[in-house]
Amino acid sequence: MVYRVFLSSTSKDLAAHREAVHRAIDGLDGFDPIRMETFGARDTDARGIDEQKLCEADLLVGLMGHCYGSSPPDNPTSFTEQEYDFAVHREMPRLMFVASDDFPVPNHLIEPDDKRARQKAFRVRVMVDR
């Protein structure tokens, strides 16, 4: 059996970590990673997450730093949080890796206060959900 693993994270602040996790999953026998980079942009990406790709997954692996990331124009919830919420709704197993409070964020990636507050609340919710 091959387990399909959906990799979820913001990309600007965690690009290197995301790539390392992808390589690790891809190198395991019996595991097939799914990530946005492999299925490319779609018309629905501007409005929300790719639920079809999430439904194909057996497991969600999430990486959480301190950046909230982007969201669709009509919804303030980030794509990463939407992916997490969809996995929760589907009762999909989740492995969430949450960066420590002192994990560095480069100055050029520091988000506005409203996004930082959303990310902080999202991080707390994920840690409580374990």
Regions found by a protein language model. Name each.
Residues 1-63, 88-90:
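Conserved N-terminal substructure of TIR/SEFIR domains
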Residues 62-66, 98-101:
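Short loop/turn segments at strand-loop or loop-helix junctions that form parts
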Residues 100-130:
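C-terminal interaction surface of TIR/SEFIR-family domains
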Residues 16, 70-71, 103-108:
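Switch/connector loops and helix/strand junctions flanking conserved nucleotide-binding motifs
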Residues 50, 77-78, 109-113:
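Short low-complexity, flexible loop/linker segments enriched in glycine and/or proline
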Residues 21, 50, 80-83, 118, ...:
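A general structural detector for well-ordered alpha-helical segments in enzyme core domains, enriched
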Residues 41-42, 46, 67-89:
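Conserved TIR/SEFIR loop-to-helix hotspot centered on a Trp-containing motif
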Residues 89-102:
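A short helix->loop->beta-strand "cap" motif at the edges of active sites that frequently abuts
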